[in-house]
């Protein structure tokens, strides 16, 4: 495939990873193997891209993996020949990993959706972006590589719409605002993320929807998509997500999980160019908790 550089100054490997669905590792492998051409010539990873450069790269062949298709309940909000939008329940892991080899969204997708994309040389059934196990809500899934590339580029260009609802601890001092703080792996706990000067830029916008004394219902819009971004940002400003097992206090709304829901998802359809927007109401336990908070 081919891309044209519009903003100069980055290393070739970083530009390739930023502008395509390829990971930085796969981008470097292709560069070392001479599979990446800049204006028809092989370049090293440290080459600084220039405006107008034409970069050619290979879409890796998909290697079949042994994830099993499982007949699990799957709330499909929308589906066509290119895209599926699913409403993931709280508690479901998106992708199989050590300790989570079954019961994941990918296992369910393999059963319900037969044609799925494979990017970076591995069959990751169409997963363009992820939400945490304990977060419920909307995810877009690509059914072919062309759709996957287009949707991934839209995410990187910050053109897609992703809004969440969360119940957070305390009362935010402002009705709306923006949290701009870089996020990277925590140096104290490698399993967690943290606001750190060494992290990647991260921006979250928030708007207060309702106040309940010790808790607040907020709508949060992602400008970037860092791991655990909303959870880290809200904890950083002193208002962690209620029920958050990693970033929240021990004293919280008990026994009901994490109150974070991906409620609104919008994107440009990769084939038709139509703007699509979907909304999934909060789960029943989330709504019941709101009712209880309103009663005081």
Could you describe each region identified by the protein language model?
Residues 1-296:
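RNA pseudouridine synthases
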């Amino acid at each position: 495939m081919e891309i044209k550089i519009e903003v100069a100054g980055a290393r070739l490997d970083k530009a390739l990873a930023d502008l395509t669905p390829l990971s930085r590792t796969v981008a470097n492998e292709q560069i070392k193997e001479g599979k990446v051409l800049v204006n028809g010539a092989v370049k090293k990873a440290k080459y600084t891209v220039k405006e107008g450069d034409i970069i050619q790269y290979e879409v890796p062949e998909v290697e079949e993996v042994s994830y099993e298709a499982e007949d699990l309940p799957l709330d499909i909000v929308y589906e066509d020949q290119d895209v599926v939008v699913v409403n993931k329940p709280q508690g479901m892991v998106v992708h199989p990993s050590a300790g989570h080899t079954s019961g994941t969204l990918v296992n369910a997708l393999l059963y319900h959706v037969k044609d799925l994309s494979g990017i970076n040389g591995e069959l990751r059934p169409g997963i363009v972006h992820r939400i945490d196990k304990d977060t419920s809500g909307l995810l877009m899934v690509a059914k072919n590589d062309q759709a996957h590339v287009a949707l991934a580029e839209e995410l990187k260009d910050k053109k897609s719409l992703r809004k969440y609802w969360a119940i957070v601890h305390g009362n935010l001092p402002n009705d709306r605002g923006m949290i701009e703080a870089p996020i990277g792996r925590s140096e104290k706990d490698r399993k967690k993320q943290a606001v750190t000067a060494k992290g990647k830029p991260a921006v979250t916008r928030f708007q207060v929807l309702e106040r309940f004394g010790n808790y607040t219902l907020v709508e949060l819009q992602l400008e970037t998509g860092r791991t655990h971004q909303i959870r880290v940002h809200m904890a950083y400003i002193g208002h962690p997500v209620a029920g958050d097992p990693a970033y929240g206090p021990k004293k919280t709304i008990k026994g009901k999980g994490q109150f974070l829901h991906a409620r609104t998802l919008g994107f440009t359809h990769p084939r038709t160019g139509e703007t699509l927007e979907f909304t999934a109401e909060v789960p029943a336990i989330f709504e019941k908790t709101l009712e209880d908070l309103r009663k005081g």
